[in-house]
């Protein structure tokens, strides 16, 4: 599933309220070396009232970063000098929270101001 910048910003703006996490497996098309990557958001283990945004780009942990703000997370030049904003159109989401990305993204992207609709 492709994800653009607006989708990623909305996904990672979802309030965790001190519990749970968002975990995204992804690849970056046309950028060798970024085939099995992870990014996410969770409560900061040391300060549960704060959120921690993170990347894990290599399975061996050599390219792993934590950020305390969405701005820093989105604008860190960790993809060969490019930011998540720069490469957002190349992001292919493989899973969200270990499930089908199209299904799970609906939960995070749903506008909570809209009334709940039943089929």
Language model: regions and residue ranges:
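Negatively charged, low-complexity tracts enriched in Asp/Glu with abundant Ser/Thr
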Residues: 1-27
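Intrinsically disordered, low-complexity regions of eukaryotic proteins
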Residues: 6, 25-27, 37, 68, ...
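Unusually extended, aromatic-enriched hydrophobic runs near protein termini
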Residues: 7-8, 30, 81-85
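Extended hydrophobic/Leu-rich segments
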Residues: 8-11, 22, 34, 54-55, ...
């Amino acid at each position: 599933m492709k994800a653009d910048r607006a989708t990623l910003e909305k996904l990672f703006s979802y309030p965790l309220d001190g519990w749970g996490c968002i975990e995204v497996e992804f690849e970056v098309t046309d950028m060798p070396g970024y085939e099995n990557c992870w990014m996410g958001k969770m409560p900061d283990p040391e300060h549960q009232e704060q959120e921690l945004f993170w990347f894990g780009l290599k399975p061996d942990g050599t390219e792993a970063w934590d950020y305390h703000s969405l701005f820093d997370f989105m604008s860190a030049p960790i993809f060969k000098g490019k930011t998540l904003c720069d490469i957002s159109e190349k992001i292919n989401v493989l899973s969200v929270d270990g499930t089908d990305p199209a299904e799970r993204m609906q939960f995070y992207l749903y506008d909570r101001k809209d009334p709940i609709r039943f089929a």
